[in-house]
Amino acid sequence: MLRGGGAHRTFVSTLLALIGNLWGLPRETALRKGPAFFDGNIWNSMKTLLIACEVLRPELEVLASDMRNPPPMNFLEQRLHDYPEKLRSAFQGLVDAFEQENDGPLAVLCGYGLCGRGLCGVHASRATLVFPKLHDCIPLLLGLDQKGANASSREGATYWISPGWLKYFLVPFHLESYRRFSVYEKKFGAAKAARMMKAENALLDNYKNACHIRWPEMGDAYVDEARKVAEATLLPYSEIWGSSAYLAELLHGGQSGERFLHLVPGQTIDMDVEGTICAVACPA
């Protein structure tokens, strides 16, 4: 699970655009205050839909299995993060269909952070959109708000590993480097495979350790595979216990105005000049 600055993101985008082919890929607005949300008994009568990145799918499905009436869940491919217009289009299409197919009060629970502003512009015509007030999904898995996530940052850069990352991330880092080269070479030829490995090495140079985010609810199911990733990438392996609290709260409606952004029709998600997640008016 990748995080970093501009140069780092360039390496990531270049690498994943190439690897995406391997697996068959094809203006400033005024701030507005968010609404009071779920007053009275409105929540009890609301129809809800969850739209989330598939990287969160293992954890969300575990939590939903313990709910009496979990919301319907739609998962979008992780690789869409590298194609923001396609991500916005896919997300918007699910919102539009949900509104067209249902009457009455509606809420869309969003299993995404700001994600590099990839979802800026998505909006609803009738539903309320509920977003975690987070820049990415790492705090969701750790159970931390953005301030807590910032305070918990480790010395040096951490390559985060989670069950969803292991299942859905495009770079086959569970394979040793010579095996990855062989996969690339068969698809693209030796010259391009060499360039892809060079991009990988530059990417991994940004990290000092690989940290597996574990949940008690998941047991030991992914430990061996996470260790293989650390070994194959030559990064020291570590573990940290995450928490299901944030994602569980999202599944139950995300009613906290401190931890969740509630967007009324005509608003979208963005961040202000200080980097705080906020609601803004959709461009006309």
Q: Model-derived features: where do they sit?
A:
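Gly/Ser/Thr-rich loops at beta-strand to alpha-helix junctions
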Residues: 51-58, 80-81, 108-120, 135-136, ...
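A short beta-strand-loop structural module common to alpha/beta enzyme folds
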Residues: 70-85, 239-241
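N-terminal glycine-rich phosphate/adenylate-binding segment common to multiple enzyme folds
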Residues: 94-148
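Extended, charge-rich low-complexity interaction segments
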Residues: 100-116, 120, 160-177, 262-284
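Long, charge-dense
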Residues: 127-176
